[in-house]
Amino acid sequence: MTTLFILNDPPYGTERVYNGLRLAANLQRLDEGHDVVVFLMGDAASAAKAGQSVPNDYYNVNKMLGNVLRRDGKVLVCGTCMDARGLAPEDLIDGAQRSTLDELTQERIVFTANADVS
């Protein structure tokens, strides 16, 4: 099974990105072989910027995205959203990939085709 997460909010200031990544990690941990794709759009694109520093004992979305990648998940970042925020591909954490809406559409098609509709 594949689960596609489309995140739009900034990495900090709300907990939507944090909670989406928590759910992604739990799916990967509890269901080996569960494919997870995280697509970062809008302000969420900055979640994949490498080298973020957060206060001690505060969640770090870089580490959370890295955990998704280490478990063979995908992290795709909207290229247009990156451009609007001055992010270059080399600014991203290792494993995150600049992407497009066309790729998101393909991921959605794969997700829909694999969905359990019973």
Predicted region positions:
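Short, glycine-rich nucleotide/cofactor-binding loops
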Residues: 4-20, 48-53
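Small/aliphatic-rich secondary-structure junction motif
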Residues: 30-48
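Short glycine-enriched, charge-decorated loop/helix-capping segments at active-site entrances
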Residues: 51-56, 92-94
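A glycine-rich helix N-cap at a beta->alpha junction
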Residues: 54-83
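Residues at the starts of beta-strands that form the adenosine-phosphate
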Residues: 2, 34-37, 74
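Acidic, glycine-rich active-site loops and adjacent beta-strand->loop/helix elements
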Residues: 9-11, 42-46, 81-84
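C-terminal structural segments of small proteins and small subunits
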Residues: 84-118
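Histidine-anchored nucleotide/phosphate-binding helix
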Residues: 17-30, 38
